[in-house]
Amino acid sequence: MSISIESYGPLNSNYINRIQDTLNKSVNEYPRTMCLRIDLHLPTDNINNHNADSTLITRFIISLKAQVEADLQRKVCAGKRVHPCRIRHIWVREFNPDGKKHYHLVLLFNKDTYAYPGSYYCKEDGYMHNLSLMIMEAWVRTLNLHTQVNYQQHYSLVHFPGECYYHLNTNNQSFNTDYCTVMDRIIYLAKEHSKIGTDRQRNFGCSQY
């Protein structure tokens, strides 16, 4: 499988190996995998309260997993068929030219459980309860912003890039091509540029399973 990496500049080979290993574990467990790219930003005020980078992402994943488990339980109680979904993740910490931190993440789901993120826009009757909403809720709760009045204004701290999700199916004839397309997109997280290695905090992490 050839992977196009030229456009991202110097890449961290260890990050590449761990990204590929995490993706492989997902498709091995779930032959139909949905890969979702998101960006997480910090509020501009009280930014010093959010310096524990690895802990911050860990809390986000824990919150998201709890919401997914509750969502699946509601569906079971409603008599709907559900599929197991062990969420895997890959994250990197980066800095803008002005020094502001943000995080790029890849979230990997069982496509039989969540095939699409769903709309993340507010409709006239509010937000639809879908994967996007659970992700935005998880980040707001992680930052402890959910106690504020009108806390949904902070949902915009989660950014869903264009073409933010991809599907992989190991049984499709196009799997190798699709796999390379996904790797070409998410290997962006392995680029050396815009990361800081002098503050003794982690710039990269991924699921250990």
What do the predicted segments below correspond to?
Residues 40-86:
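Short N-terminal edge-element motif at the start of the domain
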Residues 88-115:
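Histidine-centered divalent-metal-coordination microenvironment in nucleic-acid enzymes
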Residues 37, 70-88, 146-165:
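Short glycine-rich, low-complexity/disordered patches
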Residues 1-30, 112-209:
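Catalytic "initiation/cleavage/transfer" segments centered on a nucleophilic residue
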Residues 47-49, 73, 77, 100-101, ...:
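Short, solvent-exposed secondary-structure capping/transition elements
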Residues 37-43, 106-111:
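Short loop/turn segments at strand-loop or loop-helix junctions that form parts
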Residues 2-5, 14-15, 33-35, 45-49, ...:
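Intrinsically disordered, low-complexity Ser/Thr/Pro/Gly-rich regulatory segments
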Residues 23-27, 77-80, 88-97:
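Catalytic micro-motifs at enzyme active sites that drive phosphoryl/nucleotidyl and oxygen chemistry
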